[in-house]
Amino acid sequence: MGITAGKSVLVLLAFLAFASCCYAAYRPSETLCGGELVDTLQFVCGDRGFYFSRPSSRINRRSRGIVEECCFRSCDLALLETYCATPAKSERDVSASTTVLPDDVTAYPVGKFFQYDIWKQSTQRLRRGLPAFLRARRGRTLAKELEALREAKSHRPLIALPTQDPATHGGASSKASSD
């Protein structure tokens, strides 16, 4: 009793399907840095906002911030969601509570950790701090401009030619025609 070719192909296809599923489940996730990290956190967390480091209740001594975890190591959805802020109480929850605040207490916004303006500022801060190659590009541009200026100064003409045409401004030719 031998194994037929059809059965061996079927077993091979089943093995390949299983192997591809396992590879997809355990492959390393992508890394996220800078603006991509902030955009992804904004998408994942939505209106809740997010933290760059975990809230103090979850901190242990060896914990790293999201930049260290997602930029230098692989990052997945479950890890990103741990950095989302907890939503503030809804109006229904607040109205059901029995505590009443005095009128003279100044109201501070609660639960708005990284809304758009602050998120945009932190994105700009990240972009200012991270990419050194942009600073290098700007330095190269300035160096090229400086070199062009030096070239222009070193290649000055020996005789300074007038910028205006003497015939149109009544130079020597107009005196000769009037004589």
UniProtKB/Swiss-Prot annotation:
Prodomain positions: 92-179
Region called B, residue ranges: 25-52
Post-translation changes: Proteolytically processed by PCSK4, proIGF2 is cleaved at Arg-128 and Arg-92 to generate big-IGF2 and mature IGF2.
CDD domains with a match to the protein in the record: IlGF
A GO term from the CC aspect: extracellular space
Region span, D: 86-91
Region listing for Disordered, in residue ranges: 160-179
GO molecular function, one term: growth factor activity
Disulfide-bond pairs as recorded: 33-71, 45-84, 70-75
Compartments where found: Secreted
Region annotation (A) ranges: 65-85
Extent of the signal sequence: 1-24
GO biological process, alphabetically ordered: embryonic placenta development; embryonic placenta morphogenesis; glucose metabolic process; in utero embryonic development; negative regulation of muscle cell differentiation; negative regulation of transcription by RNA polymerase II; ossification; positive regulation of activated T cell proliferation
Glycan attachment sites: 106, 154, 163
C, as annotated region: 53-64
Top-level taxon of origin: Eukaryota
UniProt keywords, alphabetically: Carbohydrate metabolism, Cleavage on pair of basic residues, Disulfide bond, Glucose metabolism, Glycoprotein, Growth factor, Hormone, Mitogen, Osteogenesis, Secreted, Signal
Chain positions of site Important for interaction with integrin: 48, 58, 61-62
Record's function text: The insulin-like growth factors possess growth-promoting activity. Major fetal growth hormone in mammals. Plays a key role in regulating fetoplacental development. IGF2 is influenced by placental lactogen. Also involved in tissue differentiation. In adults, involved in glucose metabolism in adipose tissue, skeletal muscle and liver. Acts as a ligand for integrin which is required for IGF2 signaling. Positively regulates myogenic transcription factor MYOD1 function by facilitating the recruitment of transcriptional coactivators, thereby controlling muscle terminal differentiation. Preptin undergoes glucose-mediated co-secretion with insulin, and acts as a physiological amplifier of glucose-mediated insulin secretion. Exhibits osteogenic properties by increasing osteoblast mitogenic activity through phosphoactivation of MAPK1 and MAPK3.
Family membership noted in the UniProt record: Belongs to the insulin family.
Cited PANTHER family: INSULIN-LIKE GROWTH FACTOR II
Subunit-level organization: Interacts with MYORG; this interaction is required for IGF2 secretion. Interacts with integrins ITGAV:ITGB3 and ITGA6:ITGB4; integrin-binding is required for IGF2 signaling. Interacts with IGFBP2.
Additional detail: The IGF2 locus is imprinted. Paternal inherited gene is expressed, while the maternal inherited gene is imprinted, hence silenced.
Protein name from the UniProt record: Insulin-like growth factor 2
Organism phylogeny: Eukaryota, Metazoa, Chordata, Craniata, Vertebrata
